[in-house]
Amino acid sequence: MADSVEQSSVTTKRISAKGARKRFVGTKSASGKHSQGVDRVGSAAHRPVNQIPEEILKDTKLQEALPENYNFEIHKTIWRIQQVKAKRVALQFPEGLLLFACTIADILESFTGCETVIMGDVTYGACCVDDYSARALGCDLLVHYGHSCLVPIDATAGIKMLYVFVDIKIDTAHFVESVRFNLGAGSCLALVSTIQFVAALQAASNELSKDYQVEIPQCKPLSPGEILGCTAPMLKDKDAVIYLGDGRFHLEAVMIANPAIQAYRYDPYDKTFSKEYYDIDKMHEARQTAIKQASLASKYGLILGTLGRQGSPKVLQTLEKQLQSLNMDYIIVLLSEVFPDKLKLFKDVDAWVQVACPRLSIDWGTAFPKPLLSPYEASVALQSVAWQQSYPMDFYAYSSLGGWTPNNESNRPTPANRRKKNLHTEVIIDNVSDSKPVIKESECGSGETCCGKCTKETDKHSSTP
């Protein structure tokens, strides 16, 4: 439900889908070859490794091929393809950017001579990065458009990665004036958006700070101001939160996490400013009912999402351990998409837990005949954690509540510079007569270079570093 708030009349420039789909025609050299013949050696011999060549940056055909307010970072992409000498490049777009796919593919092929593959499977968010499919198709490089690097580039073994956020320029002045027109000066505001608008958010913050107490919150590893549909910060001492972006999916995440704070939305496309509402009590009631039903289940079904990197094996293992500790019967099912009719086929399963997208349970849980829980809700049902009065929207946050989230400290890989850390520090041990501290085999990272000051034992004694 949204209350439209009066705004000045401003003409919105629309992008023609027809124009975006036209084929790119590159310039030709005297030899009749396309621009892909850009000198890769010559002047590059004295050029810093990461500097984009001038002949790419100043190419007028590139500058005119795509909307000027959408930054597809074409120059950087061409240079990256040349850097890694990629022969086959996979391009992955969210639904809203697919209309530019053919044009971008033509540009990249014309300027680099590579072969491009447009990946057409649905891409809901940054969690859907499909490096597995790209690698299976023999691609050397995957370019993922429209989302931040939720999956680190060093985690995609076997294929190079490039993230293009697609920064979108908006009428920042109109956004700022819309806030001033509707909210009283001196208010404490939090500004959030999707990755496409974080630059505009920073610019707007600088202007709004003259009249308001403005914060751009950060939920690491996300960028300042960035929110996802499953990950949003908990805010303190704020009069309002303003979301810059279209649609409500991402906005609802921050509304669920902060039900007591009034939310507003500014749509940069139609330039409207609206007051937004979310029935948090109805949502809580529905989720608690599902949890209560699942707590009585005799057999669980664990769903691991296979749409890109959506499913987390670490989270799945955490849930398995919880069920095993309770001697619960369960099965594991791999699914790229979760539909009610599919789950109906498993008649002996009493409750489902999906390790894919928490919003699937929140938004669509009531559409399933059996309880469909998120990992957090399953942990409540299995009594591993208490129900939180503020529903946690921390699925990809480093500061998440527990091991039912992928980036929780218990699930993150140990940094390389800490893996060999020697644990020979002060150790306090009770009821041990031997003067040497007892450290478990798995805790000593020294291996054969161990100093011998500890006794590697596996016994009932416990140590507290």
Curated annotation (Swiss-Prot):
Query: Per the record's keyword annotation, is Mitochondrion included, yes or no?
Result: no
Residue ranges under compositional bias (Polar residues)? 1-14
Q: Where is this region: Disordered?
A: 1-42, 442-465
Which residue stretches does the UniProt record annotate as biased composition, category Basic residues? 15-25
One GO location term (cellular component): 2-(3-amino-3-carboxypropyl)histidine synthase complex
* Catalytic activity annotation: L-histidyl-[translation elongation factor 2] + S-adenosyl-L-methionine = 2-[(3S)-amino-3-carboxypropyl]-L-histidyl-[translation elongation factor 2] + S-methyl-5'-thioadenosine + H(+)
In terms of superkingdom, the source organism counts as Eukaryota
Q: Does the keyword 4Fe-4S apply?
A: no
Q: What is its EC number?
A: 2.5.1.108
Instruction: Output compositional bias ranges, type Basic and acidic residues.
Output: 454-465
The UniProt entry, under InterPro entries, shows: DPH1/DPH2, DPH1/DPH2_1, DPH1/DPH2_2, DPH1/DPH2_3
GO biological process assignments: protein histidyl modification to diphthamide
Q: For this protein, what does the record note about how its cofactor is bound?
A: Binds 1 [4Fe-4S] cluster per subunit. The cluster is coordinated with 3 cysteines and an exchangeable S-adenosyl-L-methionine.
One GO molecular function term of this record is:
metal ion binding
Positions bound to [4Fe-4S] cluster:
C127, C230, C357
Q: Which UniProt keywords apply?
A: Iron, Iron-sulfur, Metal-binding, S-adenosyl-L-methionine, Transferase
Q: In which pathway does it act?
A: Protein modification; peptidyl-diphthamide biosynthesis
Q: Which cofactor does it need?
A: [4Fe-4S] cluster
- Role summary: Catalyzes the first step of diphthamide biosynthesis, a post-translational modification of histidine which occurs in elongation factor 2. Dph1 and dph2 transfer a 3-amino-3-carboxypropyl (ACP) group from S-adenosyl-L-methionine (SAM) to a histidine residue, the reaction is assisted by a reduction system comprising dph3 and a NADH-dependent reductase.
Its family remark reads: Belongs to the DPH1/DPH2 family. DPH1 subfamily.
Q: NCBIfam families, from UniProt? A: diphth2_R
UniProt subunit comment: Component of the 2-(3-amino-3-carboxypropyl)histidine synthase complex composed of dph1, dph2, dph3 and a NADH-dependent reductase.
Name by which UniProt lists this protein: 2-(3-amino-3-carboxypropyl)histidine synthase subunit 1
Q: Which organism is it from?
A: Nematostella vectensis (Starlet sea anemone)
Read off the lineage from the record: Eukaryota, Metazoa, Cnidaria, Anthozoa, Hexacorallia
Give me the gene this protein comes from: dph1
